[in-house]
Amino acid sequence: MSKPLRIIFAGTPDFAARHLSALIDSHHEVIGVYTQPDRPAGRGKKLTASPVKELALEHNIPVFQPENFKSDEAKQELVDQNADLMVVVAYGLLLPQAVLDTPKLGCINVHGSILPRWRGAAPIQRSIWAGDAETGVTIMQMDIGLDTGDMLKIATLPIEATDTSASMYDKLAELGPVALVDCLSDIADGSAIAQKQDDELANYAKKLSKEEAKIDWTMDAIAIERCVRAFNPWPMSHFSVEDKAIKVWQSRVESYTGDATPGTIIQADKTGIYVATGSDAIVFEQLQVPGKKAMGVQDILNSRKEWFEVGNTLN
């Protein structure tokens, strides 16, 4: 077994907490945890600790929550810990070069894509929307660029036809910690091999917006169905009926060669609500109307049949 590393962990959401849990269970020593400051959450806007902070406190690991690393105090706090390595997973703060240079072995990051494809904030969602056959995690040595560092380990898995961003998030949250612990063993014993990224193959996974999630009926049905899966659980693909926003939870593609205007309902029964698109038809199987939970199409038609009459146009 390789020599234990003195590790600082930096992360914030549940995805990061699962990686921290794997480090705690490994033979390495987590000497400190950095996470975003407590934020207001819930209806009462009560200050709430991040999942990473909660896990660290459960294991009596010191927690640090700077707003940024601009102050000399924050930088010195990091220096004083004398870490071998910093592991960064969905931290949410930009790390200046001075921070990247502080640990003896620098900083590594777990990124939710097969780099250099899908650098940026929303790699899981963009990979589904693009119709990629696979995705994975890349563990890279961090540099000052946006997900541009040398790659140390890549682990992949297929994107299934029914995968949503929610399901892929869970799968990568299982894949990532295993790859991370393996990578740490390689770093500790000196066998890790850094591979440079090919910048010509890179593309950018920009943050999602609610505007993108509004269905464009002129797109082909395959693209719309991918959007439905990519935007689940947020911001949710949606369309409008009588100024009511309807969220789409589940859909499928059916062949259609008619000439109905995109956005027109061409069939509505217990098998689904069929809507013409730029190519073929998108069939809605599960929808959510305002103020209600997601419902199967039969329940929707029983309660809102007038909204989904054949010939109606959706916005």
From Swiss-Prot:
Function: Attaches a formyl group to the free amino group of methionyl-tRNA(fMet). The formyl group appears to play a dual role in the initiator identity of N-formylmethionyl-tRNA by promoting its recognition by IF2 and preventing the misappropriation of this tRNA by the elongation apparatus.
Known EC number: 2.1.2.9
GO molecular function, one term: methionyl-tRNA formyltransferase activity
Protein family per UniProt: Belongs to the Fmt family.
Superkingdom of the source species: Bacteria
Gene that this polypeptide is encoded by: fmt
Entry keyword Magnesium: no
Identification of the protein by name: Methionyl-tRNA formyltransferase
Entries under InterPro entries matching the protein: Fmt, Formyl_trans_C, Formyl_trans_C_sf, Formyl_transf_N, Formyl_transf_N_sf, Formyl_transferase-like_C_sf, GART_AS, Met-tRNA-FMT_C
CDD domains for the chain: FMT_core_Met-tRNA-FMT_N (cd08646), Met_tRNA_FMT_C (cd08704)
Record key words, sorted: Protein biosynthesis, Transferase
Catalytic activity: L-methionyl-tRNA(fMet) + (6R)-10-formyltetrahydrofolate = N-formyl-L-methionyl-tRNA(fMet) + (6S)-5,6,7,8-tetrahydrofolate + H(+)
The keyword Zinc belongs to this UniProt entry's keyword annotation: no
GO CC term, one of those recorded: cytosol
Organism expressing this protein natively: Aliivibrio fischeri (strain ATCC 700601 / ES114)
Binding locations of (6S)-5,6,7,8-tetrahydrofolate: S113, I114, L115, P116
Enzyme class: transferase
